[in-house]
A protein has these predicted regions:
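Non-heme Fe(II)-dependent double-stranded beta-helix
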Residues: 1-10, 17-125
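Non-heme Fe(II)/2-oxoglutarate
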Residues: 2-3, 38, 42-49, 164-167, ...
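Extracellular structured ligand-interaction cores
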Residues: 13, 98, 132-136, 148, ...
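Short, glycine/small-residue-enriched coil/turn segments at secondary-structure junctions
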Residues: 124-132
């Protein structure tokens, strides 16, 4: 499938409807529904606070994610389908990571603007080099829209200076809600974004869980990966 790398570099994202067949979607949905929880954010208690806890029942969370499920044939099949596009984004120098599910439960009000690896680290937070160091590829397993809490991104944000402490404090929420774009897709649609693009899961008002499979791709330059390993070890 064709991917416009120049468009991604200019806008920070791309959307590809109907990426998977209905059979592939069904296999991923079934796998997601039977995947154990690795970690998630619980519903707010009486004090209004949430907690990040592992291994609870899926309904105990606003949103949760599974363990890496790459050992399953259907996940590897999807990764293989993405490889030609990732190859163009990274000029052949990349590693596929991830292969886990992200689920947002109904009535979740979760929104958190952030960057992904490696740009979540201060070392690369405002790195605007030409080389793409990280890309996320997401597969919608339910209808993605403003009702279900489909992933929202802020186009062009990967080329502007932002600071994590400001995002954490919600200082860019108004801009994000005003100028952001929701990834509107039917099940089986794919979206991808430069990992430096500001994005967030959104509140789920659909009445049912909203499921996503996410696959991180990283630039495989040896020096960069060594530096990233050093940064990750500090977390």
């Amino acid at each position: 499938m064709y991917i416009d790398v120049d468009y991604i570099k200019a806008n920070g994202y791309a959307v590809m409807p109907n990426f998977l067949t209905s059979n592939e979607v069904k296999q991923l949905q079934d796998l997601c529904d039977n995947s154990p929880v690795a970690m998630g954010e619980t519903w707010a208690g009486e004090d209004g606070k949430t907690e990040y806890l592992p291994d609870l029942d899926p309904n105990a969370y606003m949103h949760w994610w599974s363990y890496n499920m790459s050992e399953h044939a259907i996940v590897q099949q999807v990764k293989d389908k993405i490889k030609p596009m990732a190859d163009k984004c990274f000029n052949g120098e990349f590693e596929q990571l991830g292969g886990d599910f992200k689920v947002t439960n109904p009535n979740s009000g979760y929104m958190y603007c952030h960057f992904d690896t490696p740009y979540r680290h201060d070392r690369w937070a405002n790195d605007f080099g030409e080389d793409i160091k990280g890309m996320q590829f997401g597969i919608a397993l339910d209808k993605f829209d403003d009702v279900s809490g489909g992933t929202r991104i802020l186009p062009g944000s990967h080329k502007k200076i932002y600071h994590k402490e400001d995002m954490d404090a919600g200082k860019h929420n108004e801009e994000f809600l005003r100028d952001g774009v929701t990834m509107e897709l039917e099940p089986g649609g794919l979206f991808c974004y430069h990992s430096r693009t500001m994005h967030s899961t959104m509140p789920n008002k659909s009445g049912k869980p909203r499921r996503l499979m996410l696959l991180l791709h990283l630039w495989n330059d040896p020096t960069f990966r060594q530096e990233l390993q050093q940064e990750e070890s500090k977390c």
